[in-house]
Structures are given as C-alpha cells and as structure tokens.
Amino acid sequence: MASIPFASRYRMIDFLLSSMVGCGIDKIEVLVRENYHSLVDHLGGGREWDLSRKNGGLSIFPPFAQKSIGSMGGGRVEALANILPVLKKQKEKYVIMADTNIAANFDFNALIAQHVKTDADITFAYTKRNCHRN
C-alpha cells in the first residue's frame, strides 16, 4: 500500500511520513514485505522529509532482515513480533505502528499525549463507523 502512487508524484507513505516529521518524530523505520523496490527508490535516504541523518532518520527494514520471512503476510501484530528483538534494543521510549492505507494528516503529538496521560501500555487510534448491511 505504501508505494501506491497518489496524484502522480506522491505515494501513500508520504502522508504518514509528513505527519510524523511534522510532529517532531525524527527516527522512522519502514517495514516492507515484498515488491518494495519502487518504494525504496521513492524514499531514497529520507532527504525529502529531512530524515537523512546519522542519528535517527529514515531506515528501511526489508523482509530478509526480519525474523521469519514466510510469516510477514500475517499483519501488523505479526510484523511487530518479527521485529521485537530489534525494538527491544531501541533507546526510544515509545513506538508508533502506523499503516499507509489512509491519505490524511494525523496529529501524533495528541496520540502520544493521551498515551502518556493515561499511562497505557498500548494506545489505538481509530475511527468508529456504523456499518450498514444490505
């Protein structure tokens, strides 16, 4: 989903990266599954988002660097389980997992503030919708 073009020049991941950088997040790791070459070309070194730096910045976590290649199709929770050893070595206090399937700007500062305020172990951001079945 991240590499799907939007308005010819952009990709879906651009919304997420711009929102994160706009909120002061300066270390972003992108987990990729398959057919990610065009995404890597698009992201480059992260310069477009001021993420080209020695400390922090943008890094791409390809499937061959993840624990079990065959199980990456399972979803977000399984992806988190696959990279848990890497996450445990991080110095950051909080981890945000976000998908690239929505074209919107998101205020991650409000999410983090609510997370800290409630002293939660996990915080989810979602939109409640009424689904009507015909």
Name the predicted role of every residue range:
Residues M1-N134:
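Unchanged
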